[in-house]
UniProtKB/Swiss-Prot annotation:
Keyword presence, Nucleotide-binding: no
Alphabetical list of PANTHER family matching this protein: HEAT-INDUCIBLE TRANSCRIPTION REPRESSOR HRCA
Transmembrane portions of the chain: none
GN (gene name): hrcA
Physiological role: Negative regulator of class I heat shock genes (grpE-dnaK-dnaJ and groELS operons). Prevents heat-shock induction of these operons.
GO biological process entries: negative regulation of DNA-templated transcription
SUPFAM superfamilies to which the protein is assigned, alphabetical: GAF domain-like (SSF55781), Winged helix' DNA-binding domain (SSF46785)
Swiss-Prot/TrEMBL keywords: Repressor, Stress response, Transcription, Transcription regulation
Domain of life: Bacteria
Molecular-function GO terms, alphabetical: DNA binding
Family, as annotated: Belongs to the HrcA family.
Protein name listed in UniProt: Heat-inducible transcription repressor HrcA
Pfam families, sorted: HrcA (PF01628)
């Protein structure tokens, strides 16, 4: 594609993102900065349509970008991108990035002393608030281990099991027992489990207990077995994806202009399997990834785009976050939001 066609395609996509209306030759002449006749512009548009980068809606003389056109745009034409590739000379871009960073930092800092799960939920909400689309975070892959447990006697036959994970999350489960344990017995049992099994997965503890049951008193054995089963349930019963701002997408005409589009939109969030697959794929790559519906089989809605970035804890990638929005979104604004949030979430979780 020659430079003239590239400029016209870039201008067309920018105007369509800004206005949401098919773009005609008069608009391209006005905004492209090229001194071309309307006939020449129409010829170039015809060539771009043949190449599959733009299409003509039946109701308009103008053109709109196709998924292939958006792909070329985000890969080669964007003037903004992740922070580490923004030119330092671009003072305005740096000011925008700084403003976004301060907003994200303030949101995450207010939850910094809380569990990692709440910090992750705050990150999803921040992504949604700043982008005005849906924010999504794939939670860290869990080892289903525990750092320590505690027992709290609620009644003669009801005990509250408190499980603290290596990530600092706290989960609770109620255990029903046939034996009336005293508070001192519960402290003794918790101390034994923490001293011998702290830091292990519940599956590993289950295996160890099978070989050590003879050394324990019968009533302690049943309590520990119940604690292992309840604890395993507590740490594994966690939604792998946190989503915030789904309702904002109902206000996006491109995604909700018909009942069929609405049904497909709700299916995306109800099933989550497609989103999980997409987030898992993006966690294996470095930096910001852009997935465009109709162009990527990973995007579960043809009019949708997903911008993602992996986040780390202590230098190791543990999950992915991103923004779900329409294909017609301001990529140069949303990409830095995703990039900064991933970096600051990594920093916040690593300090936990």
């Amino acid at each position: 594609m020659d430079k003239r066609a590239t400029i016209l395609l870039k201008t067309l996509i920018e105007r369509y993102i800004a206005e949401g209306q098919p773009v005609g030759s008069r608009t391209l002449s006005k905004y492209s900065g090229l001194d071309l006749s309307p006939a020449t512009i129409r010829n170039v548009m015809s060539d771009l349509e043949e190449m599959g980068f733009i299409a003509s809606p039946h109701t308009s003389a103008g053109r709109v970008p196709t998924p292939r056109g958006y792909r070329l745009f985000v890969d080669t034409m964007l003037t903004a991108g992740p922070l580490d590739i923004l030119g330092m000379h671009d003072r305005m871009a740096q000011q925008i990035a700084g403003t976004i960073a301060e907003q994200v930092r303030a949101q995450l800092a207010s939850h910094g002393s809380e569990s990692s799960q709440r910090v992750i939920a705050a990150a999803a909400q921040t992504l949604s608030n700043l982008s005005q689309f849906a924010g999504i975070v794939m939670t860290p892959r869990r080892t289903h281990a525990f750092r320590q447990i505690e027992f709290l006697r609620l009644s003669e036959t009801r005990i509250l099991l408190i499980v603290v994970t290596p990530e600092g999350d706290v989960q609770n489960r109620i255990i029903h027992t046939d034996t009336p344990y005293t508070p001192s017995q519960l402290v003794e049992a918790a101390n034994y489990i923490n001293a011998h099994y702290g830091g292990m997965t519940f599956d590993a503890v289950r295996e160890r207990l099978r070989g050590e049951l003879n050394a324990l008193q019968a009533d302690m054995t049943s309590l520990m077995q119940a604690a292992v089963e309840a604890g395993s349930s507590a740490v594994s019963d966690e939604d792998p994806v946190v989503i915030s701002g789904e309702r904002k997408l109902l206000e996006v005409e491109d995604l909700s202009s018909s009942m069929d589009k609405l049904r497909r939109l709700f299916a995306v969030f109800e099933q989550k399997t497609g989103l999980l697959q997409l987030l898992d794929v993006s966690s294996r790559a470095e930096g910001v990834q852009i997935f465009i519906g109709g162009e990527s089989s990973l995007v579960p809605h043809e009019d949708m785009a997903v911008i993602t970035a992996p986040y780390e804890v202590d230098g190791k990638i543990v999950g992915t976050l991103g923004v779900i929005g329409p294909m017609r979104m301001a990529y140069e604004r949303v990409i830095p939001i995703v990039d900064i949030t991933a970096k600051l979430l990594s920093s916040t979780l690593s300090q936990h």
